[in-house]
Amino acid sequence: MDFDAVLLLSFGGPEGPEQVRPFLENVTRGRGVPPERLDHVAEHYLHFGGVSPINGINRALIEQLRAAQALPVYFGNRNWEPYVEDTVKVMRDNGIRRAAVFTTSAWSGYSSCTQYVEDIARARAAAGPGAPELVKLRPYFDHPLFVEMFAGAIADAAAKVPAGARLVFTAHSVPVAADERVGPRLYSRQVAYAARLVAAAAGYAEHDLVWQSRSGPPQVRWLEPDVADHLRALAESGTPAVIVCPIGFVADHIEVVWDLDEELRAQAESAGMLMARASTPNAQPRFARLAADLIDELRCGRTPARVTGPDPVPGCLASVNGAPCRPPHCAAQATG
């Protein structure tokens, strides 16, 4: 399968105070989120001048992608400029025929995979006749470079705290019902599997997996335990130090720089615990090489590169033009 471009498809984020509320309204449209909740989340962005780190990180990643492979790279977002619909129209006008789509999510599941598939279908429909074929690359939670980057980040974080610090992996929580509809529990099982792979690569026999950044009505069950509750339990048990690895995030989203670096760190300090946060891949050259490797898997017909461990968890393969992924692991969520 030949390609003549790469599309980096991401979530998007505000780049100024005046963009924060419109961005959050885009993210939550149709979900019935009360205005006061939006006001609360807006304060997190305003703490950083109304600028999310994600777009700047993605632009730096694009430069790394251009260095890692020869195809032109385009950039589109779901929730903010540059919108993917606009980007695909530019690709059409530039004569792009088929592009590999690399998303800033390593996982299967609705918000992690299927929603990006829907973004692709919507963008192609908006572009109309002549829209390029868009091939979404597979989730990469078990790719050797994904495991290597996080294992190295844990080693760097471990140098900042005493030996014996507890290793805690975090990922974005989702409603339990949504997780059970796909796989079942495909997202949470993939995260747990990746955490096991990374912990083993980093030399840890034990680790914890917790969830963060839940939202929505309190009566709706989300994946647990929550990271704040878990940190409290560790402190009460006398754990002196913790390494927090946000394995669910490939870049420093606001959920990382606020929820972990600000709120969780303050909680750790008040409990007398030392905390070191492992870095995310962000715009590392290895992350760009990972994307280039996924492209070559399709272009050259190579067997997907995967780290294998006990009880491996399946993942989707490619999705073309907004069709369900192959195998259809995420189709249950897509069809309700």
Swiss-Prot record:
Record GO terms (molecular function): ferrochelatase activity; metal ion binding
Binding-site residues for Fe(2+), renumbered to this chain: H172, E255
Keyword Cytoplasm: yes
UniProt xrefs under CDD domains: Ferrochelatase_C, Ferrochelatase_N
Top-level EC class: lyase
Stored NCBIfam families: hemH, PRK00035.2-1
Protein name: Coproporphyrin III ferrochelatase
Gene name linked to the record: cpfC
